[in-house]
Amino acid sequence: MPVTSQPNNSPPPQQMSQSYLDEMVELHKKFMEGRVGGRRAVLRKLNLSGLSLKNRDLRQADFSGCIMRDMDLSGANFREASLYACDLCNANLNKTVFVRADLRGARIESADLAGANLDNADLRAGGFTTAESFNPGQNVNFRGANLAGARLSGTLATNADFSDAIMSKIDLTGADLRGARFEGADLTEADVKGAQLMGANMRSTILTGVRLDDIRGSGVDLTDSITDENVGKSLKDLDTPLAKLIKEHRNWVATVGKEGKQLDLSGYDLRVLLSLSGEKLTALKAVGARWCGMDMTDIQLQSATLEQSDFRSCFLRGADFRATNLKKARFSHADLRNADFSPLYFEAGGQKRASVCTMDGSNMRYANCAGAKFIKTSFKDSDLAYADFTGCDLSGADFTGANIENAKFKGAQIEGAKFDTPPAT
């Protein structure tokens, strides 16, 4: 008969200490080894936030209903454990083992599950019912999580939410994903052989390297998804080598249009370039171009026309986007730390005028914008949920109609900025 592993039978504190948790884990270890005095870890509805179980053996342990936000669970073994309705948001689950674990109703939003093993785990809906209320159960939430290289072979994940998750090279073979939501997720080179995907939503997903034959016929919504069949125009089809076109473009900029020619890469798939770090591409035109995952650190793209471009998961730290048109561009999971989206100023009719950066209708979910400058930037009707604007200069920016759910604004300058509801800073 399982016994809670509470030392000396004392009641656990509301917020458990690391030393108390370590003591329980040691008792559980003895239990799993069949040693005298061992007790199975049964911790239910406790607050373990911020603690560590790194590399610990927690097979068959019970953490049902626990708050486990921001915990370091990397390398831990939760094989056949119960994490029913747990809150694992922002936890480090790198290479964590959840084989045959009960994760029904768990909330795993923004967690790092890179290399985690969830083979045959139960990821169906779940929730707690009390005498006062009935909870029909919530779906497992992986929104924005990093599942790169994770194994979910044979898992039960009907109606699970993987929106905006990083799922490159994930193993979903034989998984039950009926009704699951993958909108905006990166499934590059994912293995979906034998997966049940009836009714799944894969709108705007990245599916390059995925066998579409394993998806077709399942009633999956692939609207606006990127596949090997529609990646866009190839740079191989350019009439002139790209290096020469860039040279002509820079000459065009330097002579204010008198010589050379503006570079137009609209509709091209540029991911094959891998890196444009430090490049000077002022006034580039690239409407609807695809840059996903590229290293563009310190790139100069002032006064460029980049609306509807896809910058998901790009490294754009220190990038210069001043006065650039970025309407309806995608930046989810992009690294935009210390980037500059400020205006450029020019003289016209004896007056100083500002050319601002426009990001109306853009998607910046989960983007890291810490320390960036967005002075007078227009974010009208943009989706900025979970974006990190810590320490940003947002003076005079326009957030009218923008979704700022769970976005971080700690230490941000918001003087003169327009919000439907001002955020806490």
Which stretches of residues belong to each language-model region?
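Tandem repeat scaffolds
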Residues: 9-22, 29, 33-425
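N-terminal acidic, proline/glycine-rich, low-complexity intrinsically disordered segments
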Residues: 1-7
